[in-house]
From Swiss-Prot:
GO terms under cellular component: DNA-directed RNA polymerase complex
Domain HTH HARE-type residues, every copy: 14-81
Family, similarity comment: Belongs to the RpoE family.
GO biological process: DNA-templated transcription; regulation of DNA-templated transcription
Ranges where the record places region Disordered: 119-193
Gene: rpoE
Any Pfam family hit: HARE-HTH
Alphabetical list of Gene3D superfamilies matching this protein: RNA polymerase, subunit delta, N-terminal domain (1.10.10.1250)
Protein name in the entry: Probable DNA-directed RNA polymerase subunit delta
Organism: Leuconostoc citreum (strain KM20)
Assembly description: RNAP is composed of a core of 2 alpha, a beta and a beta' subunits. The core is associated with a delta subunit and one of several sigma factors.
Length: 193
């Protein structure tokens, strides 16, 4: 679709991605995003301030629309121009520059508490691992506890006194409850049959 074919439609009703597709088809080459935006502004005959409010949505549509492809350096083209294999190759060409592995030196650990490197009195805190400590092992010697039965005092008198007094009150409460139905108090007024 060329810009001349878009002239038949009202410009306000056209989507910006449709206009971008027509512009890229007419130029038949990739374009930087800024040039593409300028071409769209010229076609719509709007100034930059008016177009600014639609710019972020246009960029989002450009990324999500399947008919466009970003070729790096903010250059855009039509996906139809590139077969799938060529797309992979062009992406890998950009990545080839970054293939040289960059190795970083491991940071040497320094003990800030040491006066000198040869100081033997310094505690090495790197060897302390709280997960290595064994708190769960218990020997038989630790579990054997000698208890003398004569030292343990049990007071049976109090339990007997409580038991006698409680039997009478429990029986009284049971006789009071047997005649009532607690669910009747919560009913909505319907009579049970």
């Amino acid at each position: 679709m060329a810009l001349t074919q878009l002239g038949n439609h009202p410009k306000e009703e056209l989507a910006l991605v449709e206009i971008a597709t027509a512009i890229l088809s007419e130029h038949k080459t990739v374009m930087p995003f800024s040039s593409l935006v300028e071409e769209i502004q010229d076609f719509l005959a709007v100034d930059a301030e008016t177009f600014q409010s639609r710019l972020s949505q246009f960029y989002t549509d450009l990324n999500t629309d399947g008919s466009f492809i970003s070729l790096g350096n903010n250059e855009w083209g039509l996906r139809a121009w590139y077969p799938v294999d060529a797309i992979d190759e062009s992406i890998h060409e950009i990545d080839d520059d970054d293939d040289a592995p960059k190795r970083k030196k491991a940071a040497k650990k320094v003990n800030v508490f040491a006066d000198s490197a040869a100081d033997d009195d310094v505690i090495d805190y790197n060897d302390d691992d709280p997960e290595d400590e064994d708190f769960g092992e218990v020997t038989e010697e630790e579990t054997d506890v000698d208890v003398d039965d004569s030292e343990v005092e049990v007071e049976d008198d109090e339990e007997e006194e409580i038991a006698v007094g409680d039997d009478e009150t429990i029986d009284d409460n049971l006789t009071e409850l047997t005649g009532t139905n607690d669910l009747d108090d919560l009913s909505d007024g319907d009579i049970e049959k």
